[in-house]
Amino acid sequence: KSQTLQISLPTNEKVDQTEQNKVKQSEAITIIVDSEREEAVDGVPGKVKKNYVYYYEGKPGGELGIVDENGDGVLDNANNNLKEIEFLGNANGQAQGIRAVLRERNKQVVEKIDLLKADWRAKKLTDEQYQAQAKEIRNDSTLKRPTVIIKATAQASYETLVSALDEMQINSISKYQIDNMNAADSALLKDYLIAHPRK
């Protein structure tokens, strides 16, 4: 029997333009997707060799921020809060990789959605009732829920970006956005790769 995926769009909460890109730091998770590619030929990006996903919580560099006064790419205060992780999905009924991080940060919402899903599977709710109640839960501002900012490097593949968006749906994340890499993100990634070279 074929199945369809119900897509839940991000919430339409009222946010004025100046606050749109400023997220409460305690709620923020930034995901950076990147890919290692073969050499470009005639301006065409090379084939993807491997995809990478990184994340940090709060602001770049944590509370102290980032400092690279001499511009060598190594952060002076050694406060790089960027972590490498993978898109792993579930194993033995447990979330793995970035899914586990997002699930833990959105725990209150996920627990309520899981209970609702159990009622729906037991035929206690119609599809319409389930979708309406799930939307209410995802948008309930009294629940602790993260704001996820997804950023892609110039080398990132569409596959990694789509995987990041899939994780928003899987983990019932209602507040997320795709944004551009900025200087702080690039500095964190460069510093991380100096300390942890790719093999």
List PLM regions with ranges.
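Long, low-hydrophobicity, acidic/polar, solvent-exposed interaction domains
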Residues: 2-199
